[in-house]
């Protein structure tokens, strides 16, 4: 059976047993930000096992896409070095949610393996948990497996747990003996490749308590998993998963690209490289298809490490060009019938991978050179350890992940000081955190605060009101500013990319202008930069303030216009995010933002510069949505799971509380967000993109204006356009762009003609100077100082002169703003018969103007920074020419 037939026969078998065949969940678990990648078939049913969700069926089966490349379940380091580890694999599985249990699970597994797939019964072993007598007896009663092939093991091998607490239970594994003589019983659960696990049947029947006790679950579940690639190898009689038809199309394509064949050797470097490339191409393609993006953090960095590891191995095959992106089409062709999303996203995924490959290849060769220099230095010191500082330099400067440096070091017989690397990484993060703190300028040093209340918290009331009667609970006074904490405040503190509110705090004695608002733990801190007397309105220095404990009551008022501008821009970022995902693809994720009353900035994951057409589509869609004037609904304090059920996006690495705030625009956008927003998107008025740029590899930035600011910009651009029309004397129906293009072409042609005239004029000057120059034998040589000459014209004139007079040589000099430029030439006879070398001559002369340079014997240039030495340079040149020619 080929792999397609094996997969389909599994699904058909359980379909006949009354199971619902469900689609594979994405490898990016969008509803579980605690998980990097989907790494088991049960992930999509986790809520059922935790009794937090249900399904409209009680029996299910599927083939699940899985990635294990980080954390506890991590096969990355072993991929390529053996013939069965993968970072991407399929997991065949069947489940029962409170329906059938051990009897059916065991008998059906045996039926499929022996009656449908006809695996030899005498080669199969069943392992059970030593305390699970029920399963032990069922294997004897419900199957015809030899009784001495049922083996008991302890908790380490045959007891499954979701975590330290929660659902758990015994499991029964089915192993197959692949030894030549069938003597593999002692190798069961021994980690030997000759006796491998085929299928794991997990019986979830307990709930582990915090104190370690096992309490029976009210409902018992079945969760099974079987590695698809592994069962294909067994069914097809192959020694390795990589020898099956699952991988053959990829190997054939790699051979087509590189000319290197796959020979299934365990130790051959080329075969190791091909296994790595095939595996990593699968991981990258499926992850990116399901919405992941390479980046410098979280799952994005895991993918970037995988890609860079693969590129390093591609060098083994003599490949110095991007290769992985060319395997996406192969995967889409070979697996797109099972996973149609591969074909749908093929072009986008290819572009992302190619952009990543090109970016890293630009630094890979230089990084390898530096690595080789480091190894040579380490070897010369008589040690075998690459320092953590050096490993961190490769990471920080050339983008080498630690595991790539570790791999290269191991190949050279060296180790890496990983503790030193971790120390360097922590120091960098500490510096970054300190830099961020230094930029805030809001925290007073301990002891500078004066507190009027034991409470160190502030209640935010600004979602519903821009004014609040409050009491001052703490102040920190500096010479030029004042920090104020209130017990309750309508001022929004900078958070989630939204800048802090501005406005006024008024007491009986003072009016305090708030120019920024930040958070400090549970406190909201108001930065005051202007203080005025409440009666006279005169300015007061913050250092002269005094607060009477009996007069701490105040009115806090947010600048309404400022807040409304910020709300317009914040809601616009939600619309922009949604429009980008619809236009560019689901791989787009917010990577950062800044929202103020003046403008918005939105950073997002994407692999290439947006075209003008894409920007126009995004901008048009956002404005179309604004015109719909849909209400903006804010769901306050709802359970996180309910927010996800509403469609709110959750991303790995983001921290969410159990209860969250959701901002929803029906049919357009649902986001977890604590910021302030307009009540209707129609209040945004207008949206205008002003720039699109790169922030980092794989991260783009859009800056935009809304409302009045966008209108002002458009009117400014319109007036400028009208001024241009007037300058060009164009009628209303005439195109501006066409006329400007004509003028640009005309300007270019005139510049060409001017260049010709300059060169001709300069040629005349040089020829006259050469005609009047000194001769040594049959060689004429000149030294000449020129002014206001462009280097292109000079080069053309000099080359023409040496062609016209083969027995000539010269040194020309220009000087501008203290910088000296030297140009030397030598004609064909001067070079061939007399051995003159313009490169050597100009290098000698440049020493007198404190510079350097060189070039070919026929033509060379140099630069310097000492105009006082120009005459000495000329004299040196003349002396060298006389000496060289006279010697002939």
UniProtKB/Swiss-Prot annotation:
This protein's record includes keyword ATP-binding: yes
Enzymatic reactions: tRNA(Ala) + L-alanine + ATP = L-alanyl-tRNA(Ala) + AMP + diphosphate
Cofactor: Zn(2+)
Primary location class: cytoplasm
SMART domains assigned to the protein according to its UniProt record, in alphabetical order: tRNA_SAD
Domain of life assignment: Bacteria
The protein's Enzyme Commission number: 6.1.1.7
One Pfam match: tRNA_SAD
Function recorded in the entry: Catalyzes the attachment of alanine to tRNA(Ala) in a two-step reaction: alanine is first activated by ATP to form Ala-AMP and then transferred to the acceptor end of tRNA(Ala). Also edits incorrectly charged Ser-tRNA(Ala) and Gly-tRNA(Ala) via its editing domain.
Name of the protein this chain belongs to: Alanine--tRNA ligase
Gene: alaS
């Amino acid at each position: 059976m080929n792999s397609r037939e094996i997969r389909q026969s599994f699904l058909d078998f359980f379909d006949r047993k009354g199971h619902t065949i469900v689609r594979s969940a994405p490898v990016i678990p969008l509803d579980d930000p605690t998980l990097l990648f989907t790494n088991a078939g049960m992930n999509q049913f986790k809520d059922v096992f935790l009794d937090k969700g249900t399904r409209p069926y009680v029996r299910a089966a599927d083939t699940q896409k899985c990635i294990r490349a980080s954390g506890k379940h991590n096969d990355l380091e072993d991929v390529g070095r053996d013939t069965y580890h993968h970072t991407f694999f399929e997991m065949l599985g069947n489940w029962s949610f409170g329906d059938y249990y051990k009897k059916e699970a065991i008998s059906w597994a045996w039926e499929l393996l022996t009656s449908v797939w006809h695996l030899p019964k005498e080669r199969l072993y069943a392992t059970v948990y030593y305390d699970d007598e029920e399963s032990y007896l069922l294997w004897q009663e419900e199957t015809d497996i030899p009784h001495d092939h049922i083996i008991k093991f302890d908790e380490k091998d045959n007891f499954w747990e979701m975590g330290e607490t929660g659902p758990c239970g015994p499991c029964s594994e089915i192993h197959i003996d692949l030894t030549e003589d069938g003597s593999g019983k002692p190798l069961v659960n021994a980690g030997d490749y000759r006796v491998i696990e085929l299928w794991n049947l997990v019986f979830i029947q307990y709930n582990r308590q915090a104190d370690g006790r096992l309490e029976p679950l009210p409902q018992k579940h079945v969760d099974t998993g079987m590695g698809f690639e592994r069962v294909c190898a067994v069914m097809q009689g192959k020694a390795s998963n990589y020898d099956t038809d699952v991988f053959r199309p990829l190997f054939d394509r790699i051979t087509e690209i590189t000319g290197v064949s796959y020979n299934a050797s365990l130790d051959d470097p080329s075969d190791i490289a091909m296994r790595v490339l095939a595996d990593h191409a699968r991981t990258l393609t499926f992850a990116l298809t399901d919405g992941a993006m390479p980046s410098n953090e979280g799952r994005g960095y895991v993918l970037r490490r995988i890609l860079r590891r693969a590129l390093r191995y591609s060098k083994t095959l003599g490949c110095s060009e991007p290769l992985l992106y060319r395997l996406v089409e192969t995967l889409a062709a070979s697996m797109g019938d099972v996973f149609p999303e591969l074909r749908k996203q093929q072009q986008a995924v290819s572009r992302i991978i190619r952009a990543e490959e090109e970016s890293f290849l630009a630094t890979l060769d230089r990084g390898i050179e530096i690595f080789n220099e480091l190894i040579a230095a380490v070897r010369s010191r008589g040690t075998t350890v690459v320092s953590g500082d050096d490993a961190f330099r490769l990471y920080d400067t050339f983008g080498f992940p630690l595991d790539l440096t570790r791999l290269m070091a191991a190949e050279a017989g060296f180790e890496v000081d990983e503790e030193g690397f971790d120390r360097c990484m922590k120091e960098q993060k500490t510096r970054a955190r300190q830099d961020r703190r230094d930029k805030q300028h809001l925290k007073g040093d301990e002891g500078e605060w004066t507190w009027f209340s034991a409470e160190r918290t502030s209640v935010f009331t600004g979602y519903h009101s821009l004014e609040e009667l409050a009491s001052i609970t703490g102040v920190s006074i500096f010479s030029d500013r004042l920090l104020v904490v209130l017990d309750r405040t309508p001022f929004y503190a900078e958070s989630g990319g939204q800048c802090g509110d501005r406005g006024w705090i008024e007491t009986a004695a003072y009016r305090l202008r708030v120019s920024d608002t930040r958070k400090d733990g549970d406190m909201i801190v108001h930065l005051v930069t202007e203080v005025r007397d409440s009666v006279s309105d005169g300015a007061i220095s913050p250092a002269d303030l005094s607060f009477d404990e009996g007069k701490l009551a105040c009115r806090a008022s947010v600048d309404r216009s400022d807040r409304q501008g910020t709300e317009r821009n914040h809601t616009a970022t939600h619309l922009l995010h949604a429009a980008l995902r619809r236009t560019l693809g689901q791989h787009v994720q917010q990577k950062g933002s800044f929202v103020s009353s003046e403008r918005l900035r939105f950073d997002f994951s994407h692999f290439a510069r947006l075209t003008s057409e894409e920007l126009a589509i995004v901008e048009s869609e956002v404005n179309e949505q604004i015109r719909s004037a849909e209400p903006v609904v804010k769901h306050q304090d709802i359970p996180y799971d309910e927010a996800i059920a509403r469609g709110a996006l959750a991303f790995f690495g983001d921290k969410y509380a159990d209860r969250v705030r959701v901002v929803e625009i029906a049919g357009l956008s649902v986001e977890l967000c604590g910021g302030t927003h307009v009540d209707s998107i129609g209040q945004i008025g207008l949206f205008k993109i002003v720039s699109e740029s790169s922030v980092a590899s794989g991260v783009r930035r859009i800056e935009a204006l809304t409302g009045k600011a966008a209108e002002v910009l458009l009117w400014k651009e319109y007036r400028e356009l009208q001024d241009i029309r007037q300058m060009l004397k164009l009628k209303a129906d005439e195109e501006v762009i066409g006329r400007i293009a004509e003028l640009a072409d005309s300007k270019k042609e005139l510049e060409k003609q001017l260049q010709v005239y300059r060169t001709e004029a300069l040629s005349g000057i040089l020829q006259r100077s050469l005609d009047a120059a000194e001769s040594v034998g049959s060689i004429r040589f000149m030294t000449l100082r020129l002014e206001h000459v462009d280097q292109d014209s000079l080069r053309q004139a000099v080359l023409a002169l040496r062609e016209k007079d083969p027995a000539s040589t010269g040194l020309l000099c220009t000087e501008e703003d203290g910088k000296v430029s030297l140009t030397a030439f030598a004609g064909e006879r001067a070079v061939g018969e007399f051995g003159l070398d313009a490169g050597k001559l100009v290098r000698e002369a440049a020493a007198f103007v404190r510079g350097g340079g060189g070039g070919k014997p026929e033509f060379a240039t140099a630069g310097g920074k000492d105009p006082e030495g120009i005459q000495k340079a000329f004299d040196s040149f003349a002396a060298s020419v006389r000496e060289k020619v006279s010697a002939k």
